[in-house]
């Protein structure tokens, strides 16, 4: 039963934008091999991907954050879990619950609901929301809900895009680092990590523009398959240049100004706090 005051992932069906994530997916679920391929590109990106540097930095930062959590992570919630590409970064003994919205095409979530979050107070030691929190309609209430379902001393790990395209007809948020930190201001051990800077953003957006050309190559007569080596080579060159520029940026950049692809925030619910 949905709580009367429950926060939802997105507007109700009556208010849902025409091009919301749910409507763009269509009605047919992805085939298992498609889900596996998508999971691989998110967990083990290759230089032949246009978004290689972006995903690589996100995975590296996420792996480091999860490794520092230490023992005691038994129950994990993965919000907007998608293909669940990061489950292997968690302790092998952890019980992981995947949550996704109705109509998602992946078919790997244990719980499917529009409610954010349909769980009792203090249910989890770790709550993850990787590349999905920007869809939550009320971010402050979303953070409060994450805190509610965490046990005292539990951790939240949330990542959001910063330099990325958005859908003009869908509800999405963009956050700066200080904005994210402010959302978690009543938590402990709050840290915001930038997943890449200007160089990674440049390489990813340049690759994205090139990928638009790849997807416009007609699929008939195997033309897209025949063109794939050409585009793979272009992505390798773009990612190589981006990697060199990123190393230079990290070495010489001294300004407080930044332009990351992504932001990753980690925070701890105070251990002495009682469930509200």
Show where each model-derived region lies.
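A short SAM/SAH-binding and catalytic strip from SAM-dependent methyltransferases
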Residues: 125-137
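A short glycine-rich, Lys/Arg-flanked "PGG" loop and its adjoining helix->strand segment in the class I
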Residues: 140-152
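Short conserved AdoMet
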Residues: 70-71, 91, 137, 151, ...
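GHKL-family ATP-binding catalytic core of two-component histidine kinases
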Residues: 118-120, 137, 176
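S-adenosyl-L-methionine-dependent methyltransferase catalytic module, highlighting the catalytic core
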Residues: 140-141, 155-271
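Conserved N-terminal segment of class I S-adenosyl-L-methionine
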Residues: 1-117, 126-128, 258-264, 270-276
